[in-house]
C-alpha cells in the first residue's frame, strides 16, 4: 500500500530518531518473503547489498507489526504524524468507542483543523506487558496543527470524552514526515 520515513521531532538520548513505516493491504502481503527489497535490482535497479551496506552506522530497534482496524485515508500529504500508544483493558471496547465517537467527529471536523488523516491499529507483534496493544495516528499538514491537537485544541474539541473508552497514553511521539508514498485506494 505504501511506505513513509518519519523523523522524531523530540527524541531522548536513547530514543529512536527515525521510523520506517510499511503499510500492506493484508497479513499475507506483509509476511511475503519476496518483497521488493529482496529483489531490488529487478524492481528499482539497485543491488540488495547496496541497500543493506554499512549497517554498522545505525542502531536498529525491532520491528513492530500492527493491523489497521479503523482509518480515514489521507486527503492530502501529511507533514507531521502523531503516534498515540495505549494498552486498554478491553481493546474491542476501545475500537467500538473510537468507531462510534472519534471517527465520525474527525471526519466531520478534520478539514477545519489541518488534520489530513487518522487511524487505529492493534498490535500483532511483539506482545506483552512492555508493549502497547493499540496505536492511533493523527496526520496533520503542519507542525502547528499537530501541536494544537496535543494541546487538546482544534479537532479534539467537542469529543464526548465522558462517553468514550478511556485511553491512558503511554507514549505520544510527534513525527515529521521526511518522505512517503501515496497509498493506492
Describe the function of each predicted region.
Residues 1-45, 50-185:
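Short S/T/G/P-rich N-terminal loop/turn motif that feeds into the first structured element of a domain
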